Amino acid sequence: MRRSAVLGLALAAAYGAWGLAQPAGAPTRVTLSQGTSMAAALSPDGRTIALDLLGALWLVPAEGGPARRLLEDGYDAHAPAWSPDGSRLAFQAYARDTWHLWTIRADGSDLREITAGPFDDREPHWSPDGTRLAFSSDRSGHYDVWTVTLATGELTRVTTHPANDSMPAWSPDGRDIAFVSDREARGIYARRVDTGAERLLAGDKAVLYTPSWTPDGTTVAYVAVDGPATRLMVGGTNIAGPQEDVFPFRASWASPTELLYTADGVVKRRARAGGEARTVPFTAEVAFTRTPYTLRAREFSPEGPQPVRGLMHPAISPDGAAIVFAALGDLWLVATTDERPEPRRLTDDAFVETNPVWAPDGRTVAFSSDRDGGVALWTLDVASGAVRRVVGDGTTAAFSPDGRRLAYLDGESVLRVVEVASRESRQVHTRIFEPGRPSWAPDGKAVVMSALKPYSTRFREGTNQVLWVAVDPTPTPDGRAAFAPDRWMDPIPHKSVGMRENLGPVWSPDGRSMAAIVDGFLTVYPVARDGTPAGPPTRLSPELASSPSWTADGRRLAYQAAGGLRVVDVVDGRVRQIAPRLTWTAAPPPPAVTVHAGRLFDGRAGSAVQRDVDVVIEGRRIVRVAPHRDDQHRGEVVDASAGTVVPGLIESHTHLSKAYGEAQGRLWLAFGVTTVRNPATNAFEGQEEREAIESGRRIGPRVVTTGEPLDGSRIYYPGGVALDGGGLVDQQLARAEALGFDFIKTYVRLPDRLQQRIIEGAHRAGLPVTSHEIYPAVAYGADGVEHVRGTSRRGYSPKMSELRRSYGDVEQLLIASGMTITPTITIQGGFQVLTARDPWWVEDPRVARLFPPAVAEAGRALRASPLAGAELAAREALVAPQERLVGALVRGGGRVIAGTDSPINPYGVALLSELEHYVRGGLSPADAIRTATAVPAEAFGLGRDLGTIEAGKLADLVVVDGDPLARITDLRRTRLTVRGGVVHPVDRLLAPR
């Protein structure tokens, strides 16, 4: 059996059957004539063009015409390269968890996988004799050029520089390989194959891509991207048009005097001497059938007591008798001797307490809280309830074995140690990218953390591995003292150990083991005294787990599952279930209230502004919207006769942070935001946020939430679930149902076929799925796409070019499918552009009083050194196409929902800025407001309750001074927000708690 056939069977088993049958019904057919970020390669005989479009390979006649597809969905194929005899194509594909090289015959037969394994192999190019492929790979810890001999599979490393070398191209005579390098003298180099001698072919301050040798081998063509401009270079001459959007892929030489390349969404031919380019037209048809399903209903104010799901960061006491955890904003304690214990509340206030950890004596708990305004570390005497502030700006912490010190991470992820008694704090390590909670070595001389270990600096993804860090300096031979160097420890090569956050590793008190969450399960492995792995891992939990913690004797571990708390005996493996009897009840309905609006926009499509109307609210819902009459008023009357009333705003992409404390909820309402959607979070933190707000323990918006994003074997952000091989899909979906997720988020390294399985499983449960992908996500039935650009495993965006332009494929697929898109223009340079034009928010009292001081400080720094002149014009040139895309999508019937990826830019402020971008892109203010009200409400299955101001809907609305239907910037002028019938004047929201 051929290797490709064996691979097909293996993939079908791991990822589910390919080509699953679709229900009867007419498919949607889309004919494309443009592609975004597509590559093209001309065959050696000059008769056929190979395109990579939508993650598949297509063949087009050299003079243009219909495209013939070579590959089905699921391979994510890119970078096609013809063999010298024109019989085969090499390409890179992401069929499983890593990029590998493949070849296929030009007739679509004999598909072969050439490389395999845990490393990424990209950008193939044939040797002139057709026996080898040059490619780039991260096998050495950075990207180098390698070759593979096709007959034997033998791999040879070509470049060895510690910088990243990539995008190789063999010279016509086979003596040299050209490549791009990011070494100190950045540029395109050539390396002599037989001697290893290297020379610089082209240096440039711009970012360079994909060399292609001239037919005579004297120089190379390449692409340069320089801010808002791209160049197609031959030697030192730019032959591209002045506004041309040249895609960063290898050009083909049609003759010694003409190149074929991709730009402006099409294939072009251009003479080496310059002049006008000639477009090669093509059409490519895709067809898909999206299966309807019923979204699971969300009850915002359920009747009666509800079980608390948001138990955060449980930790077992040293003697194993109790577990402390956070829920509903407070700390709680339960005994481990009862399967249904009654919790004891340890704190009871309006603030947010979280991240509890026991001192070794079992009498004290350290935790983080915003009880004095900013998030700080505190200690609590469990017996007396006395609390004591230890240090400011502390998040996750761990007690030293002697209990005298706390190792902790500050708000910038800098590792520090504080003496508990004296409260003296010192830095022990520079900033680490969002590591997990530290865990002390038993000798108290070091800590370990789960931290991201990227495979290279070219791309950001990697695995979570164990980072050992010394916390005290040691004497050196010269009599001074220095910190021992960091050490990486990889207990399970190429597999994440812990998911950062509070998921291990946790060093056992006896120093003999570490516990961590691996593949979603509680796992322990033996270690030497210095933490070096000393044996194979053992899985202890029968279910997905989080938050491991040891008893002092090292005999038991507590962990958290979707169904509650667990304690496992490390020796005999027995697991005891502990389900605390903790419930929450929806806040009672508020008294009746009437809002008298001078102007009202109800949020419905095509709806005109109504004048002088009353919105009558009883309990949580609107009972009447009618022309103003004093005799129909009920309860308190809110006089908005001089202002405008619009539906409460929905922020469709934000990441909530416990570091903002309880003020986070107030700041959202202060900007008119009554619902937020959090597309990636710790699952239990997301549930806690929802339950604390719905129960009335905290003021805040409604929370639409998911859990940790589902990803491939490599991850980037903490909490990312590495679905190695797809074996945990069913368990993760079951967990999502059990915890009441509102939707599922998949991330960029998840293979397409796994995404298909997740979409189908989530839809069976009534849960929508969103990701960064458009195709084949569209064909698989995905519900949404995040970011008009965003991170991509390909190293470039298939949704937007380097000049931030999107073409017909993006527009047509989004409009035809009805899939939502959350553009997040503000994080693609938009926020800086608008702030340069008008830094209105910098001194806004909402920012001054509700945000951490660093936010306002950053704003003042922007205002002090604003973008201006040519730099501002360059940024605006990159932002304007994104704005125009939004306008085109909405005019074409597409579904745009406003979101920002805050707090990259400030909460609330960023959403208002995002809507201003949409108006700049051609939307009316009314249509822009709908992207943050009615459209997302319908998309999330919440249209019955949210999104418009109509009788029967929940009373979520905003009163603003001015007229945002005439001037979208007036939406900044929030006077009060009504959320579920509760009136929140802005001045009251700004008052300290």
Predicted features, each with a name:
Residues 45-47, 85-87, 129-131, 173-175, ...:
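Short coil/turn segments that connect the beta-strands within blades of beta-propeller domains
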Residues 50-58, 73-77, 90-102, 106, ...:
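A flexible loop/linker signature enriched in serine peptidases of the S9 family
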Residues 61-66, 606-646:
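Histidine-rich, glycine-flanked metal-binding segment
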Residues 601-614, 627, 880, 906-909, ...:
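Acidic, glycine-enriched loop/beta-strand segments at the rims
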Residues 664-684, 702-708, 738-749, 759, ...:
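Divalent metal-dependent hydrolysis catalytic cores, especially in the metallo-beta-lactamase
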Residues 732-750, 791, 796-921, 993:
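Active-site neighborhoods of metal-dependent hydrolases
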